[in-house]
């Protein structure tokens, strides 16, 4: 497989650079930068030793005995700190943080994250190929290394939902020709791959032909299905469901991306890995989705490593997974190791438990110090991303299910995340279905202008009692306008607030908007600062806590954003109706029988 690379601004194979580095390593020329007084974590052996490090341009020229050299243009005092390679986030979506790539880079670099593998499928689902091109251009000049992947499942479940675009194998192949694209992003249409669907087979084969990564999303796959998924050419997974699932997929040979957004499973994962007595070379780390308040308060991949250590993983294991193992997966021998001849991506941490970064170096340049950015970050014009929510105002009647008769039997979607089909009987009043006691409503309206925008309505059980409504255009993965609630009036109110804002999140209760976060860029992100976005998102959380009673780990706020992910097994509400990828069934209306 080819090395996975963006178009690096500094070529390590430049003969002049190598000649300068060799001369400096011999002692015949000074270093550009010399880091002294620190201790070095060897990501391969896990050992910590005292060492000084000499840099020439973007290259590590020397790792040598402490105080044995003093000749350098700039000397950095690392006393008391521990030096590691820059952290590598193996799977993430910038859009989940609801800020621009430039703002995201400014957030994670001060935490020691120097490389991320970004699947821009949220932009792809809304803006199509132009959205992916915008993401590539936005990432190109940032001091954060962003390796983009070609979104493989746009939409996630063809025929069951309608997104803003449709990426077939020809579109994927076009993206893969870009040096900025490192492979095929998480293949979520598992059933299509396993069943040999021509569309999905062609997409995976495009990735294989490119020699680049083919990444997976193998939630719930076992036995013959897992073997078939891997036999098609998929080589990784971040959708682990238990410690037993982790053990099985490690044994199967998948590269594992331990996912920080599944915090309730991390301790179980640590116990499994500790039981092995060693860290497999195929274990890496990822954030996947980090909300803006979490990013602002805690950071990115450093927080995943920090929690793993808190749950009992050896710090050197967590950092190896986040550096050397990740670089090996990417076939990037220049990354993931502090050694002569490698790329100068370095982090100086205060210690190996709290992992607070004192200094961050990327390509031999100081980009952040003591939690603040020092490198310039140039944002890209966001004008191409506006006006993506193409819906007229909605009314209360749009959030009711019409029916004639006295009573009705309806289909329901039971419980968050691991959904199941259910049924309920209820009455019909004034020509509309009365929501069954204890249920909530979910409505999805197509917002991309490719079909009518009348919401399709479903009924949720196991979601608790709703005392208001929540509307979002962040709704994986087609990102149609999605509304939850127990009252049609509040649902219409929240929906219209979001439509007026051009996309975003809104909470309504008792006929009034309680909180709103406008996301006018693709209905996914804002060009506001992370600080302001985090504050507004926190207000949304607080408002949501007042209208619904959560029950972790599955009935949680985050579940609202994945309730329409139709590629996952079981029934999910989409803009087409209640869809089940396992059977291919779509119910345009939840009404099954009228009495």
Swiss-Prot record:
Catalytic reaction list: adenine + H2O + H(+) = hypoxanthine + NH4(+)
Cofactor(s) listed: Mn(2+)
EC assignment: 3.5.4.2
Keyword Hydrolase attached: yes
Pfam families documented for this protein: Adenine_deam_C, Amidohydro_1
Identification of the protein by name: Adenine deaminase 2
Superkingdom: Bacteria
Listed GO biological process terms: adenine catabolic process
Organism of origin: Rhizobium etli (strain ATCC 51251 / DSM 11541 / JCM 21823 / NBRC 15573 / CFN 42)
Record flagged with keyword Hydrolase: yes
GO molecular function: adenine deaminase activity
Entry similarity comment: Belongs to the metallo-dependent hydrolases superfamily. Adenine deaminase family.
Listed InterPro entries: Adenine_deam (IPR006679), Adenine_deam_C (IPR026912), Amidohydro-rel (IPR006680), Metal-dep_hydrolase_composite (IPR011059), Metal_Hydrolase (IPR032466)
UniProt keywords, alphabetically: Hydrolase, Manganese
Lineage, broadest ranks: Bacteria, Pseudomonadati, Pseudomonadota, Alphaproteobacteria, Hyphomicrobiales
């Amino acid at each position: 497989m080819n090395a996975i690379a963006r178009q690096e601004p500094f070529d390590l194979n430049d003969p002049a650079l190598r000649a300068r580095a060799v001369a400096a390593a011999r002692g015949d020329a000074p270093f550009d930068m010399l880091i002294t007084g620190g201790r070095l974590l060897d990501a391969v052996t896990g050992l910590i030793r005292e060492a000084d490090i000499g840099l020439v341009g973007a290259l590590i020229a020397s790792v040598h005995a402490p105080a044995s050299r003093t000749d350098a243009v700039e000397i950095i005092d690392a006393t008391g700190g521990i030096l590691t390679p820059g952290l590598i986030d193996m799977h993430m979506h910038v859009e989940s943080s609801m800020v621009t790539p430039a703002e995201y880079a400014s957030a994670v670099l001060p935490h020691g994250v120097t490389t991320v593998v970004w699947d821009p499928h949220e932009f792809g689902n809304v803006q199509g190929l132009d959205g992916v091109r915008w993401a590539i251009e936005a990432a190109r000049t940032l001091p954060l290394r962003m390796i983009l992947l070609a979104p493989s499942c746009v939409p996630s479940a063809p025929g069951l939902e309608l997104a803003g675009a449709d990426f077939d194998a020809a579109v994927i192949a076009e993206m893969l020709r870009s040096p900025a694209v490192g492979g095929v992003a998480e293949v979520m249409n598992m059933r299509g791959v396993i069943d040999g669907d021509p569309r999905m087979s062609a997409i995976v084969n495009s990735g294989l032909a490119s020699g680049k990564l083919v990444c997976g999303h193998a939630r719930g796959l076992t036995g013959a299905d897992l073997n078939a998924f891997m036999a098609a050419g998929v080589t990784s997974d971040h959708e682990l469901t238990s410690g037993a699932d982790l053990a099985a997929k490690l044994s199967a040979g998948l590269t594992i991306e331990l996912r920080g957004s599944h915090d309730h499973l991390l301790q179980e994962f640590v116990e499994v890995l500790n039981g092995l007595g060693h860290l497999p070379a195929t274990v890496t780390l990822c954030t996947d989705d980090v909300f803006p308040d979490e990013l602002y308060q805690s950071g990115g991949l450093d927080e995943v490593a920090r929690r793993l250590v808190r749950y009992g993983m050896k710090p050197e294991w967590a950092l190896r997974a986040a550096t050397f193992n990740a670089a090996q997966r990417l076939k990037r021998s220049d990354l993931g190791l502090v050694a002569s001849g490698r790329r100068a991506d370095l982090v100086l941490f205060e210690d190996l438990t709290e992992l607070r970064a004192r200094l961050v170096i990327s390509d031999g340049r100081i980009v952040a110090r003591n939690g603040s950015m020092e490198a310039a970050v140039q944002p890209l014009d966001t004008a191409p991303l506006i006006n993506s929510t193409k819906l007229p105002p909605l009314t209360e009647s749009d959030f009711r299910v019409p029916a004639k008769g006295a009573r009705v039997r309806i289909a329901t979607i039971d419980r968050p995340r691991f959904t199941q089909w259910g049924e309920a009987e209820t009455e019909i009043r004034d020509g509309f279905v009365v929501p069954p006691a204890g249920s909530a409503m979910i409505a999805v309206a197509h917002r991309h202008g490719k079909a009518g925008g009348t919401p399709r309505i479903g009924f949720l059980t196991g979601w608790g009692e709703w005392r208001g409504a929540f509307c979002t255009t962040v709704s994986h993965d087609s990102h149609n306008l999605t509304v939850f609630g127990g009252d049609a009036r509040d649902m219409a109110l929240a929906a219209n607030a979001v439509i007026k804002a051009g996309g975003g999140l809104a909470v309504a209760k008792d006929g009034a908007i309680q909180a709103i976060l406008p996301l006018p860029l693709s209905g996914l992100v804002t060009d506001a600062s992370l600080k302001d976005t985090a504050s507004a998102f926190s207000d949304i959380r607080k408002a949501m806590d007042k209208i619904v009673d959560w029950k972790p780990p599955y009935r949680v706020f985050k579940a609202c954003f994945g309730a329409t992910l139709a590629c996952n097994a079981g029934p999910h509400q989409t803009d087409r109706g209640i869809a089940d990828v396992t059977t291919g069934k779509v119910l345009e209306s939840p009404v099954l029988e009228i009495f």
